[in-house]
A protein has these predicted regions:
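Cleavable N-terminal export/targeting peptides
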Residues: 1-36
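Short loop/turn motifs that connect adjacent beta-strands in outer-membrane beta-barrel proteins
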Residues: 23-40, 54-55, 70-80, 105-111, ...
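Transmembrane beta-strand segments that form the barrel wall of outer-membrane beta-barrel proteins
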Residues: 42-51, 77-89, 112-121, 153-158
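Solvent-exposed loop/turn segments connecting transmembrane beta-strands
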Residues: 50-60, 86-97, 124-131, 161-169
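Outer-membrane beta-barrel "beta-signal"
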Residues: 58-64, 167-180
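Membrane-embedded beta-strands of outer-membrane beta-barrel proteins
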Residues: 62-66, 98-100, 138, 174
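Residue-level signature of outer-membrane beta-barrel architecture
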Residues: 66-70, 102-104, 142, 156, ...
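Helix-adjacent hinge/juxtasegments
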Residues: 91-115
Length: 180
């Protein structure tokens, strides 16, 4: 229980005190109204199935993620911005992470790949072989309003063979993103 409280407090601290890539702000036009849009950060709440491809270790999960598009870097693949979050499974396995993402907008459809290193605690869940794990994620979402998206995402969590074993875990989630 103390670990869960620590994780919740730590993530809340990260949300309030985000580490900056850059303090530059890009003028972003709202795709609905054509006016300046200052809603460039978001909170993503998600729920789904952790390690759905392993019948013996499958578990429900719930998580939250902060996406901050105010802090970005222009690169060859687009604007990369920070993302921070955590999830916990029904077996008390938890993962806290921070990394990068980029967003590609196709009308109302959004494709958001991300890469996030983090710390994994197995609890009563699957042993992934290391405390240090890496999450590769792709999210497909649809704008349902000026500041809300609904979507689905898939991720793979793995230790990149840093541990003695590397079973990995594949997960899917349903996402609700609120921009502010």
């Amino acid at each position: 229980m103390k670990i869960k409280l620590f994780v919740i407090y730590f993530v809340a601290y990260l949300f309030v005190n985000s580490v900056s890539f850059t303090e530059e702000k890009d003028s972003q036009m709202n795709s609905y109204t054509g006016i300046l849009d200052d809603k460039t950060s978001g909170l993503n709440v998600y729920s789904g199935m952790f390690d759905f491809s392993d019948d013996g270790q499958r578990a429900s999960l719930i998580g939250i993620e902060h996406q901050n598009h105010n802090l970005y870097r222009d690169t060859l693949i687009g604007k990369i911005s920070p993302v921070t979050g955590f999830f916990i499974t029904e077996n008390n396995a938890s993962y806290i992470y921070t990394g990068i993402e980029t967003n590609y907008k196709l009308g109302r459809l959004n494709i958001t790949p991300s890469f996030t290193p983090g710390l994994y605690a197995k609890g009563d869940g699957k042993d992934l072989g290391s405390v240090i794990e890496f999450k590769s994620d792709v999210q497909l979402s649809y704008d349902i309003g000026e500041s809300m998206n609904l979507g689905m995402s898939y991720n793979h969590v793995s230790n990149a063979s840093l541990g003695d074993k590397n079973p990995g875990a594949n997960s899917y989630m349903f996402n609700f993103l609120k921009k502010f």
